[in-house]
């Protein structure tokens, strides 16, 4: 399985990747992108099976990225891993087709719980 991690912070991309492994999902191929615009190109080239995206990023936000994926006809399971979680954000994410919104800080157990339905 290939997982795309999208975050403008390199450190956060590494934390998310490490937490995926700590949650028991070792051996999966993890690819990265710095923002939604770059992530769209990675999706086309790498064809990930799951996308984990930050919400607030320069150039193209996470919700704009999700909207662009939908507009281009991609049907890839998508979840947000972001620093805040308001009711409005959760509603917007759900309406856009996101499967979950995991707010930072999160634990390996939190990651295992949300990814369990998507990652074997």
Task: Set out the residue ranges of the language-model regions.
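Helix N-cap/capping motif at the beta->alpha junctions
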Residues: 32-41, 62
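C-terminal output helix
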Residues: 106-115
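Short amphipathic alpha-helix used as the core "switch/output" element in two-component signaling
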Residues: 41, 63-74
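Receiver (REC) domain active-site loop signature in two-component systems and cognate sites
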Residues: 57
């Amino acid at each position: 399985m290939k997982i795309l991690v999208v975050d403008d912070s390199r450190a956060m991309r590494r934390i998310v990747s490490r937490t995926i492994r700590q949650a028991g999902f070792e051996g999966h191929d993890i690819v990265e992108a710095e923002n939604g615009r770059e992530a769209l190109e990675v999706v086309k080239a790498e064809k990930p099976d799951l996308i984990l995206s930050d919400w607030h990023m320069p150039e193209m936000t996470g919700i704009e990225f999700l909207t662009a994926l939908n507009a281009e006809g991609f049907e890839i399971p998508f979840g947000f891993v972001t620093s805040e979680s308001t009711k409005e954000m959760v509603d917007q994410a759900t309406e856009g087709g996101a499967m979950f919104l995991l707010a930072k800080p999160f634990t390996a157990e939190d990651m295992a719980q949300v990814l369990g339905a998507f990652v074997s």
